Amino acid sequence: MAKKQEFTFKQFHINQDQCAMKVGTDGILLGAWANINQANTLLDLGTGTGLIALMLAQRSPEHCQISAVELDQLAYLQAKDNIQQSPWANKIKIFQQDIIVFAQDCEHKFDVITANPPYFKQGVDCASKQRNLARYTLTQSHLDWLNAAEKLLNLTGEIHLILPFEEGKSLQKKCGLFCIRECKIITKAGKTPQRLLLSFSREERKCEESQLVIYDRNNQYSTEFKTLTQDFYLNF
């Protein structure tokens, strides 16, 4: 089934007909879950439609500055338009650049960095090169994404990611940062976790572990999912 070409939230609207990767639950979870307390500068890597950057803008105080990076030209232009049409056009800056190059060139450091990186390994070709690049782990590994984010991170900052469960567990073992929060995402009550929300820091401290169920056994959105996302979804 084709996804909608637009998506309306409580405080902003997303057009996505030019973007390979559409608005999805993963991005909404990350945008709502990421800890942005006391953050002044925020960065969303691989912003796509601009969804997470806009969610961070909605959640953060007016003085905060948000940057977003997107390589694909069509996605960049659409995210730029989505941002300009939002209430936070003066709060978000967007850059068309590869995240590795951006990490090398950018002189600024950020308090909070978010990323919803591509997660399917190369296999069956997608219908378009644009979607192929957006969806598959072709050009950079998840460790590359985390290393790029680390270069851009303030000393006391935090990086927040969402990944498939096994890839997330593997990344925790490979990276040189400390995992300080881990939330197992269970699509339906009684099932095994499919995703991991992860927070990384340079500072070592006890990892806060939790889990979140999206659908209960009656195929209804769980109370915890509604609570997390109620500031965004129109029907919550």
Swiss-Prot record:
CDD domains: AdoMet_MTases (cd02440)
Keywords (A to Z) from UniProt: Cytoplasm, Methyltransferase, S-adenosyl-L-methionine, Transferase, tRNA processing
Pfam families documented for this protein: MTS
InterPro entries referenced in this protein's UniProt entry, alphabetically: SAM-dependent_MTases_sf (IPR029063), Small_mtfrase_dom (IPR007848), tRNA_Adenine-N(6)_MTase (IPR050210), tRNA_adenine-N6_MeTrfase (IPR022882)
Localization per record: Cytoplasm
SUPFAM superfamilies: S-adenosyl-L-methionine-dependent methyltransferases
One Gene Ontology CC term in the entry: cytoplasm
Chief place of localization: cytoplasm
Gene3D superfamilies, alphabetized: Vaccinia Virus protein VP39
Reactions the enzyme catalyzes: adenosine(37) in tRNA1(Val) + S-adenosyl-L-methionine = N(6)-methyladenosine(37) in tRNA1(Val) + S-adenosyl-L-homocysteine + H(+)
GO molecular function: tRNA (adenine-N6)-methyltransferase activity
GO biological process, any: tRNA processing
Annotated EC: 2.1.1.223
UniProt record similarity statement: Belongs to the methyltransferase superfamily. tRNA (adenine-N(6)-)-methyltransferase family.
Described function: Specifically methylates the adenine in position 37 of tRNA(1)(Val) (anticodon cmo5UAC).
Protein name (database record): tRNA1(Val) (adenine(37)-N6)-methyltransferase
Species this protein is from: Histophilus somni (strain 2336)
Lineage summary: Bacteria, Pseudomonadati, Pseudomonadota, Gammaproteobacteria, Pasteurellales
